[in-house]
Amino acid sequence: MMRTLITTHPLLLLLLLQQLLQPVQLQEVDTDFDSPDDEMEELEEYLEEFQSRGPTRPPTKENVERRVIIEPGMPLYDRDYCNEEIKRKNVYHKYRCVTEHYFLLMQYDELQKICYNRFVPCKNGVRKCNRSKGLVEGVYCNLTEALEIPGCEYKSFYRTGYVLITCAWQNEIHKLIPHTINDLVEPPKHRSFLNEDGVFVIPP
């Protein structure tokens, strides 16, 4: 019986063993697959990234779309938006909660084009980011409780602002692709200007 299980369902057995041996349980996975092969490949990729002790893997289009781009469904003003979506999209770093995260209501192609916009200072003032030319709707998630999963709790903030992102060169496709969302900067309610560094300056 055991030999049959090992030879016919090695991946299933591996997943069961991982569940038993890991001190932290993985997020529940939806088993209502539209495309079993694609979903299983995504699960294997997630497990590899989740349990890796090495450096974070370089970003991919699929990874950015899954973790950042908003899908139709829950209202952006919902106070539990971040708690629900971060769990559903498995937005974690190794076994730890991310301290902040952004979900954006835009197409991936639009986000990628921002990589070729002018540089502006990131919100930490150290690195350089690319800024969107227009306003984008999104949700900012800020960690309020716990540091390790599954106890992550977030406060959700709906925003409409300019997206600041960092990008990385991907050799396989010879293009810049989004790497991280640095900020979603809301413009002042009254008249303002952008100086040459892309920073908002309030006129006297």
Curated annotation (Swiss-Prot):
Does not exhibit any ribonuclease activity. PANTHER family: INACTIVE RIBONUCLEASE-LIKE PROTEIN 9, RIBONUCLEASE. CDD domains: RNase_A. This is Inactive ribonuclease-like protein 9. It comes from Chlorocebus pygerythrus. It comes from the Eukaryota. Residues 1-26 form the signal peptide. InterPro entries: RNaseA (IPR001427), RNaseA-like_dom_sf (IPR036816), RNaseA_domain (IPR023412). GO terms for cellular component: extracellular region. It is found in: Secreted. One of its GO terms (molecular function) is nucleic acid binding. One of its GO terms (biological process) is defense response to Gram-positive bacterium. The gene is RNASE9. The keyword Protein biosynthesis does not apply. The keyword Hydrolase does not apply. Glycans are attached at residues 130, 142. Disulfide bonds join 97-152, 115-167, 122-129. Belongs to the pancreatic ribonuclease family. Keywords: Disulfide bond, Glycoprotein, Secreted, Signal.
